[in-house]
């Protein structure tokens, strides 16, 4: 079989073997490469996190085993820029936590943001996540609603404002709305607290729908 995958994570298996988590045309998969951590092996460095690889492989015991690497695009080089590294890491973590199935439009979205030059990785990540929800058919309704007061309650089923639900700061919802609406969203300054709480509520919303 042949497939194209993004490398999301790799770990050492034993002393010299490599185990990597990939996302691509077969969904989210685990790859095993015997002696993959030996630098004299020809595939050493191929399965670096963030690289895009096209491989010929077979499946064994729930793992995919590469027969050959047909093509590799070393997106890991982009991670030398710390802001791009943060954005790629945020996206990889989201896919690792939540996405198991393959969707062509979703894969294209991930690649587009992986290749994006960013000056504001937190704002870019929120933009990615809101696009992710739209691609999956879960775009929250609060993005088109007027948010007032100091706090609001969010209905996780529809993502709309409600008299009950998850309590969220109105300023945070308005921040997400602004990022959703603006083309020049990278100009928006994201405080650490806003990023952490915004990420938490978006992941909670996505988890609610994926686990129904």
Swiss-Prot record:
A GO biological process this protein is involved in? double-strand break repair
Pfam families in alphabetical order: RecO_C
Gene3D superfamilies, per database record = Nucleic acid-binding proteins
Q: Name one GO cellular component term.
A: bacterial nucleoid
PANTHER family, per this entry? DNA REPAIR PROTEIN RECO
Identify this protein by name: Uncharacterized protein aq_2203
